[in-house]
C-alpha cells in the first residue's frame, strides 16, 4: 500500500494526502517555473535529465515516506525511537522495483519538478541517509555495550561462585582441623583407652581359642563313641569277631577286630571330615554337637562296610604298635586328624592357603570358609565330585574283580560261571580250625563256589574292600617311585599313540615331559596341546576337558614359568622347583620297588606292577620285624616268588608246617599275561592302587588326589 501511494503521488502530482501541503505547493511552483523557463531545460540532454530526474524522484519519494511515518508514529517512550529508523531503509530499497523508466520519462515530460527542486531534494536525501547511518551506528554501539555488560555480569557471577566454593573448602578444612584437634585432645586425655581395647581383643581371642579346644575335645569324644557304635554294628552284621569276654572295643583295639590299617585310617578320616564340616556349621549357626554327628557318621561308615568281605584277624603285635604311635603323636592328634588340614596347607577345594599351625588354620577356616553362599556352592560341587568318583569307583572295582578272576583261573579248566575273587583272599575260619589245619586245599571247579587260594594265617594283601580306601583310583607308580616318565613311555609308545587309554601320569608330569622333549626347552600353549594329541590317542577326544586341566596346571604349579619372547608367551620348566615339589610329595623308600626294564613287554610291566603292589602292601609289616611271625613272613615271601614266576609247582603234597619251616610253600598261582584291551571305555587303572595302605603311606594317598580333581575340571 505504501508503494502504490508513493507511485500515485509522483505520477498524478496530487500530494494532498496525509497533510502534504508543503510538498504540493513546491510542486505547483516548480511547474510554473518550468513552463516559464523552457529554455534552460532544453539545454540539458534528455539522457542526463532522465537519469537525474529519476534519482530525484526516488529521493523525494523516500523523504515523503519518512516524514509521513515520523509524523504519525511519534510516541513519548524512548524505546520506540529506534523503530522508525529501520523502516525507511526497507521502503527505500523496495521503491526502485516499482518506479519504472517509463514512469520517470512521463514525470520529466510533464515537467513536474525543475532541476533546482531535484537538487534540493537530493541534498535532503543525502542528509537523511547520513542520519540513518548515524542511527545505525548508534544502535550497533548500544548492542555491543549491552553484550559487554552481559559478559561482565557473567564473569562476576563466576567469580562469586568461585569465591563461595573457596570459602566452603576453607570451612571444611577448618572443621577437619577442629575434629583432628578434638581427637588429639581426647587421646591425650584418655591415653589408656587404646591399651584397654587391645587387651579386650586379646581376651576375646583367648576365649575363642579356649572354645575351639573345648569343641575339639568334644569331637574326639564323639569320634570314639561313634567308632565303638560302628564296631558294634559290624559285629551284629557278622563282619568281625569279638572275644566273648570283651563287651566294647576301644579305638586302639581296631586292628585286632580284623580291619586293616588302611581301613582304620580311612574310617578315621571320614569321621573327622564329617565332624569338621559340622563343627564349622555349629560355630556359625549355633547347632548342637550331639544331634547330627552320630547319625551321619554311622550311615557313612556302615555304607563303606556294606560289601560282605571276610577278614583274618591281624597279628597280635600290631595293636600295641599303633598304641605307641598314637601316644607319641597325641599332642598333634587334632591337627593331623583334620581332613581339611595337611602339611601346613588348607585342603579346602581351590584354597591351598598356607597355615603355620593348627590354630591359625582354624582361624582361617572360620574367617574364609564360613557358612555363606560360596562355601555352600563349593560343598555342592564336592558332593557332585564324590558322586562321580563313587560311580567310577564301582566300575573300577568290577573291572578289578574281573581281572583278578581271570588271572586266578587255570586256563586248562573250563569255568561255566566264574565269580570274582581276591588275588590273595582269606577264608573265614575259627581259631580252632586255624590251629588244626593251617593250610587249606583249593576247591575243585565242580563245586558251586569259586576256587580259593590256600594261604596261611596272615593279613589280606589285596581285597576289594581296600580299593576305596587308597584315595586315588589311578596310582601313578612311575611318579611315586621316581621312575623317569620317558623310560615307561618308550616301550609302550605305539600302544599309547594308537590305543584310547589314559596314560598313568599327572598333567604336570606330562607338561614337563612335553617341554623337556622340545629343542629349546620351551613351548607355547598350542604346542603343548599338539604334543598331547600327537603322543596319546586318549587326548584326541574331549579336548575341552583336558585342555582346561592343562591350563589349570600351568597356572597352579610354580615349576612352570611363563616367559614373553618374540614368539609370544612360552612356558618353561623350573627344574629345581619341580624336584622340590616331588621331594615334598614322594614318601616311602623307592628301593623296595624293582625298576621296570625298558625291554620288557606290556605283560612284563603288569608283573612288575603286581610286584610293586605286594611290596607296598607288605611295607608296614616288613618295616617292623616284631610284627610278623614265621608263618606271615613265609607267606609274604611265597607270594612274591609266586608272582615273579619263579615257582611253577612246588611240593605237590602241599604239606609244610609254619612252625617248623620259616618259608612254607604254597600252591602256585598261574598268572596269565595278556595286554590290556584298547577298546575299554574307561581309563586303565594301575594295579598299584589295589595295595593296602598303612598310616605311614598316607602322604602317598594325598599325592594322587590331584589328578582326579584335574580330570573333573
Swiss-Prot record:
It is found in: Nucleus. Residues 290-303, 436-457 have a biased composition (Low complexity). Its main location: nucleus. The keyword Methyltransferase does not apply. Residues 420-424 are annotated as: CTBP1-binding. Residues 1-28, 313-322 have a biased composition (Polar residues). One of its GO terms (cellular component) is nucleus. Residues 697-713 have a biased composition (Acidic residues). Keywords: DNA-binding, Metal-binding, Nucleus, Repressor, Transcription, Transcription regulation, Zinc, Zinc-finger. A zinc finger (C2H2-type) spans 344-369. One of its GO terms (biological process) is regulation of transcription by RNA polymerase II. It comes from the Eukaryota. InterPro entries: FH_FOXP1_P2 (IPR047412), Fork_head_dom (IPR001766), FOXP (IPR050998), FOXP-CC (IPR032354), TF_fork_head_CS_2 (IPR030456), WH-like_DNA-bd_sf (IPR036388), WH_DNA-bd_sf (IPR036390). Transcriptional repressor that may play a role in the specification and differentiation of lung epithelium. May also play a role in developing neural, gastrointestinal and cardiovascular tissues. Can act with CTBP1 to synergistically repress transcription but CTPBP1 is not essential. Plays a role in synapse formation by regulating SRPX2 levels. Forms homodimers and heterodimers with FOXP1 and FOXP4. Dimerization is required for DNA-binding. Interacts with CTBP1. Interacts with FOXP1. Interacts with TBR1. Interacts with ZMYM2. This is Forkhead box protein P2. It comes from Gorilla gorilla gorilla. The gene is FOXP2.
Amino acid at each position: 500500500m505504501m508503494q502504490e501511494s508513493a507511485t500515485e503521488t509522483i505520477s498524478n502530482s496530487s500530494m494532498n494526502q496525509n497533510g502534504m501541503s508543503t510538498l504540493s505547493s513546491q510542486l505547483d511552483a516548480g511547474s510554473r517555473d518550468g513552463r516559464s523557463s523552457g529554455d534552460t531545460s532544453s539545454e540539458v540532454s534528455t539522457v542526463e535529465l532522465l537519469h537525474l530526474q529519476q534519482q530525484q524522484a526516488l529521493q523525494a519519494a523516500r523523504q515523503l515516506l519518512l516524514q509521513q511515518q515520523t509524523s504519525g508514529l511519534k510516541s513519548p517512550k524512548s524505546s520506540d525511537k529506534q523503530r522508525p529508523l529501520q523502516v525507511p531503509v526497507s521502503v527505500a530499497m523496495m521503491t526502485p522495483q516499482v518506479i519504472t523508466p517509463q514512469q520517470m520519462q512521463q514525470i520529466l515530460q510533464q515537467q513536474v519538478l525543475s532541476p533546482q527542486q531535484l537538487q534540493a531534494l537530493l541534498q535532503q536525501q543525502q542528509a537523511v541517509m547520513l542520519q540513518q547511518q548515524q542511527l545505525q551506528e548508534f544502535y550497533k554501539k548500544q548492542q555491543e555495550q549491552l553484550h559487554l555488560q552481559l559478559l561482565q555480569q557473567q564473569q562476576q557471577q563466576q567469580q562469586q561462585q568461585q569465591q563461595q566454593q573457596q570459602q566452603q573448602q576453607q570451612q571444611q578444612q577448618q572443621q577437619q582441623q577442629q575434629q583432628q584437634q578434638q581427637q588429639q585432645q581426647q587421646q591425650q586425655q584418655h591415653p589408656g583407652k587404646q591399651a584397654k581395647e587391645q587387651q579386650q581383643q586379646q581376651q576375646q581371642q583367648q576365649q575363642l581359642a579356649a572354645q575351639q579346644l573345648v569343641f575339639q575335645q568334644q569331637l574326639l569324644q564323639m569320634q570314639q563313641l561313634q567308632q565303638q557304635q560302628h564296631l558294634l554294628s559290624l559285629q551284629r552284621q557278622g563282619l568281625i569277631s569279638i572275644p566273648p569276654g570283651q563287651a566294647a572295643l576301644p579305638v586302639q583295639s581296631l586292628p585286632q577286630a580284623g580291619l586293616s590299617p588302611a581301613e582304620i585310617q580311612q574310617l578315621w578320616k571320614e569321621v573327622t571330615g564329617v565332624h569338621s564340616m559340622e563343627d564349622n556349621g555349629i560355630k556359625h549357626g549355633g547347632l548342637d554337637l550331639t544331634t547330627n554327628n552320630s547319625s551321619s557318621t554311622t550311615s557313612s561308615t556302615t555304607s563303606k562296610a556294606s560289601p560282605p568281605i571276610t577278614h583274618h584277624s591281624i597279628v597280635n603285635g600290631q595293636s600295641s604298635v599303633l598304641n605307641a604311635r598314637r601316644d607319641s603323636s597325641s599332642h598333634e592328634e587334632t591337627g593331623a586328624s583334620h581332613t581339611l588340614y595337611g602339611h601346613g596347607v588348607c585342603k579346602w577345594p581351590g584354597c591351598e592357603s598356607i597355615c603355620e599351625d593348627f590354630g591359625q588354620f582354624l582361624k582361617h577356616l572360620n574367617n574364609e570358609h564360613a557358612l555363606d553362599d560360596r562355601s555352600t556352592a563349593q560343598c555342592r560341587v564336592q558332593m557332585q565330585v564324590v558322586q562321580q568318583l563313587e560311580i567310577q569307583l564301582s566300575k573300577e572295582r568290577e573291572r578289578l574283580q574281573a581281572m583278578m578272576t581271570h588271572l586266578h583261573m587255570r586256563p586248562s579248566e573250563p569255568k561255566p560261571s566264574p565269580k570274582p575273587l581276591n588275588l590273595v583272599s582269606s577264608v573265614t575260619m575259627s581259631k580252632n580250625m586255624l590251629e588244626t589245619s593251617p593250610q587249606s586245599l583249593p576247591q575243585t571247579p565242580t563245586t558251586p563256589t569259586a576256587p580259593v587260594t590256600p594261604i596261611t594265617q596272615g593279613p589280606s594283601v589285596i581285597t576289594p574292600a581296600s580299593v576305596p580306601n587308597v584315595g586315588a583310583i589311578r596310582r601313578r607308580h612311575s611318579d611315586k617311585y621316581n621312575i623317569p616318565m620317558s623310560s615307561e613311555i618308550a616301550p609302550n609308545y605305539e600302544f599309547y599313540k594308537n590305543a584310547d587309554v589314559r596314560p598313568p601320569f599327572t598333567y604336570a608330569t606330562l607338561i614337563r615331559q612335553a617341554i623337556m622333549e622340545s629343542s629349546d626347552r620351551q613351548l607355547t600353549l598350542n604346542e603343548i596341546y599338539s604334543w598331547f594329541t600327537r603322543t596319546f590317542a586318549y587326548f584326541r577326544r574331549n579336548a575341552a576337558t583336558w585342555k582346561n586341566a592343562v591350563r589349570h596346571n600351568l597356572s597352579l604349579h610354580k615349576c612352570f614359568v611363563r616367559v614373553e619372547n618374540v614368539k609370544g608367551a612360552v612356558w618353561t620348566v623350573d627344574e629345581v622347583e619341580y624336584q622340590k615339589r616331588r621331594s615334598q610329595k614322594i614318601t616311602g623308600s623307592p628301593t623296595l620297588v624293582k625298576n621296570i626294564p625298558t625291554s620288557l613287554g606290556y605283560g612284563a610291566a603288569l608283573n612288575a606292577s603286581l610286584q610293586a603292589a605286594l611290596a607296598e602292601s607288605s611295607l608296614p609289616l616288613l618295616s617292623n620285624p616284631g610284627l610278623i611271625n614265621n608263618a606271615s613272613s613265609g607267606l609274604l615271601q611265597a607270594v612274591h616268588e609266586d608272582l615273579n614266576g619263579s615257582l611253577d609247582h612246588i611240593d605237590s603234597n602241599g604239606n609244610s608246617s609254619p612252625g617248623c619251616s620259616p618259608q612254607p610253600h604254597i600252591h602256585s598261582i598261574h598268572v596269565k599275561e595278556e595286554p590290556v584291551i584298547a577298546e575299554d571305555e574307561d581309563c586303565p587303572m594301575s594295579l598299584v592302587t589295589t595295595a593296602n595302605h598303612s598310616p605311614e603311606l598316607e602322604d602317598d594317598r594325598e599325592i594322587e588326589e590331584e589328578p582326579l580333581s584335574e580330570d573333573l575340571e
